[in-house]
């Protein structure tokens, strides 16, 4: 089941983020950099703000939280961003990521395009987005919490 995240879900989201990040980025981002980011981006205060200002969805499997997705609302230009989509490793490949993605897309009927930024080495995510119609626009180098990364920018056309 996919539903909106509530304040009661904050601890579960923090746990999903921690486990998913360790699994996803184990060979891409050093552990200390991951922890630094998780402490900031997934603090209770930050998650509460994200719940108020964004589309924040939870995936449940047999009534247990196992994944989440976070989208910005469509801006005045018709653009939105998928800022996070994570599913616990044991629950990947069963369609929950797809359900989270399409549930978020339903929330932006008047949008023009949805952007997502993916670490270039995150092949699983790249395959996932390309499977559902995202197109890679560019790749660029940047620093993430002081750590050099190569990032791929993808776009999905919302009204084509």
Please state what every model-predicted region is.
Residues 101, 108-118:
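Conserved GNAT acetyl-CoA-binding A-motif
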Residues 103, 127-128:
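Structural preference for long, well-ordered alpha-helical segments within the folded cores
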Residues 4-10, 14-92, 101-107, 140-142, ...:
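Acetyl-CoA-dependent GNAT
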Residues 98:
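Residues forming the Rossmann-fold NAD(P)(H) cofactor-binding site
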Residues 149-154:
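Short hydrophobic/aromatic beta-strand or adjacent loop that forms the aromatic wall/cage
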Residues 115-126, 143-148:
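Conserved beta-strand-loop-alpha-helix junction that forms the acyl-donor binding cleft
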Residues 95:
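Conserved G/P- and acidic residue-centered "switch" motifs that form tight phosphate/ATP-binding loops
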Residues 128-129, 134:
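Conserved active-site tyrosine of GNAT-family acetyltransferases
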